[in-house]
Design a protein with these regions (language model features):
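Periplasmic/cell-envelope proteins involved in peptidoglycan metabolism and beta-lactam response
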Residues: 1-277, 301, 376-388, 496-497, ...
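Beta-lactam-recognizing serine transpeptidase/beta-lactamase-like catalytic domain environment
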Residues: 68-70, 192-203, 244, 249-307, ...
Length: 574
């Protein structure tokens, strides 16, 4: 009797435990089916859906007249889906033949157990079409876009290029990434439990949105004129490089920017001017590529030499420490403290007025007026003119001015600064600063970007840039235009003169560091018309061989450019 009671209690405990377990399972099932159903439906959907990206077309870059400078070509991405492959050996053989890849690499990817494995990107469309037409099970051919530059080397360091993911790496391509890149779309396909895509099942598709078009101030024809002139002097003078920049001094729009030698934007990882028989490490190759991609107009600094006398003269006229009628004596040198600083004319210029001093590019004259101005005021004008700030050009990697601290500027430093030595600036900084001194006295922002457009050319928005007034007075600016016109017509800039045109400018010949290397930089800054400048250009020739004077070799380059550009811009002869 006692055993029966015990067994009955035991059975009841088991029964209640079973009821509790079943209730808990039932409750959990109800919760999953009703309250958490959406979550598990999503998991199930994700398990049987495969997402593939549809690449968005990158926006084009067009010049001021709508000439396409950067666009896209259709290419293909070849992938394999392991679970769908029926004949691996055939797939491997075909892909090796069509793609020109090593069998070991192809086999490794084909045999890898994964939902989808990329074999190769940026495959030419013709090749992709051939592979697609073979209808190989497990092989996917998706269309993609590759950046294409119709003019190869044209403005290479300005336009820049994109990487394998079609994102900008240098130049305008990276600066305007947010404008140019589009929004990728997606394709969702349904698969069975083995990961095989189901046929005749509707795909969920989100269409890509193409990037916007960037219109820039560069003019295709003006750029070509500048490229031809720069290449010619580069070859004739066997120079290390030549830079040419043309801009509108009234609004900062850049018409042309050339840096020779240019590289091919469609093959940006191929080095130029390199002996193929010379072996390099990967690090050396990368360093050489980095140097090839540099834009000397904005990335590299140099001692401006006598073109800086434009800035010294402007500061001294504005401050009132010199007048046009002041007279000076040049014996061919000036003694400053314990230094004998020479003029380029060894025998000296003798007695001369300030006007003659700037025409003759006389160092002693500029030493004298620089010392009159003094270090603190000179430094203040450096700031006022914007020389100690970046120009904020819309290209990445702009270098800043390399200048002494004001407390470190002694009399010798002040003397050499006055004629453009012992500090360094970029060509774009020189062009921008001189623009502000001849345009009436306001500083512009040099730039390429003009407008963002729809694909059909409809304007979305104009790009705006800052201007800073009060750089110098209109009177000082007018005086500088007159002085610099006289330099071209009567002084050291005569080789920049074009009959019938009014041109102002200044030449320079500066020595690079270390001085013992005997390497020079020849340059010329010129603008036209002198009375109302509409175009300003700077030419910088690095390490020319033979004759290296700026007035002899740099001024003629800008003259040859202006021979074509001034009529092209509608600037008529007087």
């Amino acid at each position: 009797m006692k055993n029966k009671t015990y067994n009955r209690k035991k059975a009841m405990v088991v029964f209640f435990c079973a009821v509790l377990l079943i209730s808990a399972l039932f409750g959990r099932l109800v919760y999953l089916m009703i309250f958490d159903a959406a979550h598990y439906q999503k998991l199930a959907k994700d398990l049987h859906e495969r997402e593939r990206k549809i690449k968005a077309a990158r926006g084009e870059i067009v010049d001021r007249n709508g000439v396409v400078l950067a666009t896209n070509r259709t290419v293909c991405t070849i992938s394999v889906i392991h679970n769908q492959i029926k004949d691996p050996e055939q797939v491997i053989a075909v892909l090796c033949q069509e793609l020109g890849e090593e069998e070991e690499n192809i086999r490794k990817k084909v045999e890898k157990v994964s939902s989808m494995e990329k074999i190769k990107t940026n495959v030419e469309k013709e090749t992709g079409d051939r592979i697609r037409n073979l209808d190989l099970a497990g092989v996917k051919v998706d269309e993609d876009f590759k950046r294409y530059y119709p003019y190869d080397t044209f403005a290479s360091r300005v336009l820049g290029f994109t990487g394998g993911d079609n994102q900008g790496i240098i130049g305008l391509e990276v600066k305007y990434e947010e404008v140019l890149k589009g929004t990728d779309g997606t394709i969702l396909t349904v698969t069975d439990a083995r990961g095989v895509e189901l046929e005749k099942v509707a795909e969920d598709r989100i269409e890509p949105v193409a990037g916007n078009t960037l219109q820039i101030s560069l003019d295709h024809n003006i750029q070509k004129y500048c490229e031809q002139a720069a290449k010619k002097v580069h070859e004739e003078k066997q120079a290390d490089s030549v830079s040419v920049l043309l801009m509108n001094p009234q609004d900062g729009e850049i018409f042309a920017m050339v840096n020779t030698p240019e590289f091919n934007l469609n093959t940006p990882f191929e080095l130029i001017d390199v002996d193929e028989n010379t072996e390099q490490t990967d690090e050396q190759t990368q360093e050489m590529l980095n140097q090839m991609w540099r834009n000397p107009c904005i990335n590299d600094t140099y001692e401006p030499g006598s073109t800086f006398k434009i800035i010294t003269a402007s500061a001294c006229l504005e401050e009132g420490v010199v007048s046009l009628s002041d007279t000076f004596s040049c014996p061919g040198y000036r003694i400053v403290e314990d230094r004998k600083i020479r003029c380029h004319k060894v025998g000296g210029h003798g007695q001369e007025t300030f006007i003659q001093g700037i025409q003759n590019s006389c160092n002693p004259v500029f030493i004298d007026i620089g010392l009159r101005l003094g270090a603190e005021k000179f430094y203040a004008y450096f700031k006022q003119f914007g020389l100690l700030s970046l120009t904020n050009i819309d290209l990445p990697g702009e270098a800043g001015t390399i200048m002494h601290n004001v407390e470190d500027i002694g009399l010798v430093e002040l003397a050499t600064i006055s004629f453009g030595q012992s500090f360094q600036v970029t060509p774009v900084q020189m062009a921008t600063t001189v623009s502000s001194l001849v345009n009436g006295g306001y500083r512009v922002t040099p730039h390429f970007g003009v407008a963002v457009l729809e694909k059909d050319g409809t304007e979305i928005r104009k790009l705006k840039y800052k201007k800073k007034n009060g750089i110098v007075s209109e009177k000082t600016s007018e005086t500088m235009r007159i002085l610099l016109k006289s330099v071209v017509e009567e002084g050291s800039g005569k080789n920049g003169y074009i009959e019938g045109y009014s041109i102002g400018g200044k030449t320079a010949t500066s020595q690079t560091l270390p001085r013992s290397a005997n390497k020079y930089i020849s340059s010329f800054i010129g603008f036209a018309p002198a009375e109302d400048p509409q175009v300003l250009g700077i030419v910088v020739i690095r390490n020319p061989q033979g004759i290296y004077y700026g007035g002899t070799i740099a001024a003629p380059v800008l003259r040859s450019i202006y021979d074509n550009v001034l009529p092209y811009l509608g600037i008529e002869k007087n």
